[in-house]
Amino acid sequence: MKTVKLPQGTLSIDANEFLIIDDKKNEPQYKAVSDFVGGMVEVVQFPNGDLLLLNEEGKLMGLPVNEKASKLWSETFTKDKYAFGHDDFVVGPAILIKKDALNTWAN
């Protein structure tokens, strides 16, 4: 388990950590997100405007499936609405920044 410093304090994280940010004052900077996900940050914009931040190379690194983030993914990107991506999954630590909490990441 590792620790990372985010605006809401220092967190101990494991591979299945799923953090939800819903306040602009808690929006993390890139370095903190990179530390949290353990590498390069991939940003996925959800149809409702929320952003999911995860490790871009997580699958190549063999990170374990993140059950909470994968559940959100499968509930959002359903087969009836999306030709691809509906059967995908999220691995490693992930952060969801709610649309109303976006500041820096929205640019």
Residue locations for each model-derived region?
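Short beta-rich binding modules
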Residues: 1-107
